[in-house]
Amino acid sequence: LFNEERFRSIPIHYRLNRIPSYGFIFYQHRSAASTNNQFIPYPFYARPVAVRPHAQKPQWQDQPNVYPPTGARRPRPHASFIAIPPKKNQDTTAIPAINSIATVEPTLIPTTEPVVNTVVIPEAASEFLITNTPETTAVQVSSTVV
């Protein structure tokens, strides 16, 4: 408890300058030099100030932060002018925007005709085999040519 009280009374800048992990990061140690010496480089440049004995400050009028309007203001219409008036005829049916009288053309689906393949079997030369591709059925037809 005695060490904490004694450590708390030490100023913070003295404490940070004495601890190397903090002091060299936060405080740049440089030698004291006057700012008006032209031979010593100094990181901060002072602004030259011209002093006149009888110079008057310009007296500016305090103006608001918004710009004044450039022309005459146009009147705003009242809110009732913008509102949509109610419909007068509630009994009549509304005309739809879409033309429902137009005929709807059905979409044509392309039909595939069955392809007939004629295959000659060497064992039975007198018979032809006809097959339909979609149904894959075989039909034997006897020919008159021998």
From Swiss-Prot:
GO terms for biological process: lactation; protein stabilization. The record marks 80-81 as: Cleavage. It comes from the Eukaryota. InterPro entries: Casein_kappa. Keywords: Glycoprotein, Milk protein, Phosphoprotein, Secreted. Glycans are attached at residues 107, 112, 118. It holds the Pfam family Casein_kappa. It is found in: Secreted. The modification Phosphoserine is found at residue 143. Mammary gland specific. Secreted in milk. One of its GO terms (cellular component) is extracellular space. Belongs to the kappa-casein family. Kappa-casein stabilizes micelle formation, preventing casein precipitation in milk. This is Kappa-casein. It comes from Dicotyles tajacu. The lineage of its organism: Eukaryota, Metazoa, Chordata, Craniata, Vertebrata. The gene is CSN3.
